[in-house]
Amino acid sequence: MQLNKLMLGFMLCASALADDGQQAAEPHTSANFCKIDKDQQVGSTCDITFHELNEINEQIRPQLARLVKTDFFRYFKLDLYKECPFWSDNNGYCVNRACAVDVVDDWESVPDIWQPEVLGGLDEDSVKSEGGESDECSFLNELCGRRREFARPEPLSIDYCDVTDFTNKDSVLVDLVANPERFTGYGGEQSAQIWSAIYKENCFTLGEQGFCLAKDVFYRLISGLHASIATHLSNDYLDTKTGKWGPNLELFMARVGNHPDRVANIYFNFAVVAKALWKIQPYLERVEFCNVYDTNVKDMISNVVSRLDSRVFNEDLLFQDDISMRMKDDFRRRFKNVTKIMDCVHCDRCRMWGKVQTTGYATSLKILFEMDAGDEKARQRVVDKLTKYELIGLFNTFDRISKSVNAINNFERMYHSQMETNTSSIAAFFQNNFFRLGFTETEDQETSNATADMPLPEDSASDNEPYFADLKIPARRSKKQTKEESTSALQQELQGVYHALQFIWNSYVNLPRNLLILVLDVANTWFNNFIGVPTQINILGDDASD
């Protein structure tokens, strides 16, 4: 029963967020963009409305955007060339320049806290005798590589991502601000394989009823991540005609906006990450952020986290003490696999941001699932196991999901503006969603692109609905032709064949004459050079004689 209560809480919130109905032909109002009523309460476990979440995001957005650009939060470490652990496809790469990542090479431009001697330095005080843990995996009170002697807890298997990636000898330091997440053109069969593998991780082995609920929760987290990435790339899209980056409303509506459940899952993920940050707020106040950056960074973190509302999630209903350990272990293992699947992405920039965001969601799940509300020592133990890269990933992921929510509201304004200026054509476009016309369900799944380019899978609740139920396919022109039209078309084709054969025949007939002219011209040039007559003078003489 407790297991059911755990995941039922998630489902109540997620179900209230999602609207699985078909795309209606009725005009959208300002309170019903993408068929979501913003004044609707999210649910019994999420005592907050969409409108209130938008207000929270408006309050924290400017400060959060500045926070992730500070010296501490703008750098991340990962292995861009780690082999894919799931299939043997490690030689592929994206040839587009937009896929590349500019790694940190000029160390003089990097703050002291990110210098190699701080990142990779080891000494007796900074190495744990049992595990040999370096400063890069030090705890929150050692974020700047400071050496302190204190009793560390025994290692716990509570990680939802592979933290060893941060200490890999082949890992490189990247500046997230210098490598923004935007449309790269990466897609096709390989990217579809990536997302297919990610969604297939949502296959829990145990047959308990609670795992059906866990499957839905897992799906909404991944769907929210996928929809958020699609929103980012739609919001920062390269217009090949103007050469400028900007929002692409049509792409957003095709990938996200015409699917209310995807929009809802973005808000769902916003709530998950926001609650995780709110939950560790008391511990963040005791974190030291490196000398001159300490006060400024702490103030910005406080300004962001203090505005979060505890009503966004009621974890007392979601995370009980007697959660089935088998379910939680399976959930943890599968989400860790999701972070590892990112090593299979051929686009370096897509891989980088995929790693950052899956690390952020993994950190959120660790905080929400593993921090026991009734045990202060257990909570402190979980916080002590957080690495600085998990904290960096957590805040950058919150910035990404916050930017998605902000972009959704911006796309809403663009949507209504176009509806007012050209109601008939724009309305028909958004209702019909012609990007998917002419595709069968199988073709759509096989040829869809990843990140922004691959349409997200529909919610399982709508599997039994007609796939094109929301489309109004225009009547096709009859393919029957009259006898006169057929005769005319045949004559045109025969005439084209005749001219082609005539051209080939004339080429062969004129070949000897053309070869003779070529030989004489070369011989004339050679002879003039032999007798000492410059070619240039000879040409001038010919011109003069004319």
From Swiss-Prot:
Sugar-modified residues: N337, N422, N449
Cofactors required: FAD
Single Gene Ontology BP annotation: protein folding in endoplasmic reticulum
Compartments in which it is found: Endoplasmic reticulum membrane
Keyword Hydrolase assigned: no
Molecular function in Gene Ontology: FAD binding; protein-disulfide reductase activity; thiol oxidase activity
Membrane topology annotation: Peripheral membrane protein
InterPro entries in UniProt: Ero1, ERO1-like_sf
UniProt enzyme class: oxidoreductase
GO cellular component, one term: endoplasmic reticulum membrane
EC numbers, comma separated: 1.8.4.-
Disulfide bonds: C84-C344, C94-C99, C137-C161, C144-C290, C347-C350
Domain of life, per lineage: Eukaryota
Residues involved in FAD binding: R182, T184, W195, S223, H226, R255
Active site positions, chain numbering: C347, C350
Signal peptide range in chain numbering: 1-18
A Pfam family reported for this protein in Swiss-Prot or TrEMBL: ERO1
Keyword field: Disulfide bond, Electron transport, Endoplasmic reticulum, FAD, Flavoprotein, Glycoprotein, Membrane, Oxidoreductase, Redox-active center, Signal, Transport
Family membership noted in the UniProt record: Belongs to the EROs family.
Assembly: May function both as a monomer and a homodimer.
Function: Essential oxidoreductase that oxidizes proteins in the endoplasmic reticulum to produce disulfide bonds. Acts by oxidizing directly PDI1 isomerase through a direct disulfide exchange. Does not act as a direct oxidant of folding substrate, but relies on PDI1 to transfer oxidizing equivalent. Does not oxidize all pdi related proteins, suggesting that it can discriminate between PDI1 and related proteins. Its reoxidation probably involves electron transfer to molecular oxygen via FAD. Acts independently of glutathione.
Name used for this protein in its record: Endoplasmic reticulum oxidoreductin-1
Record organism: Eremothecium gossypii (strain ATCC 10895 / CBS 109.51 / FGSC 9923 / NRRL Y-1056)
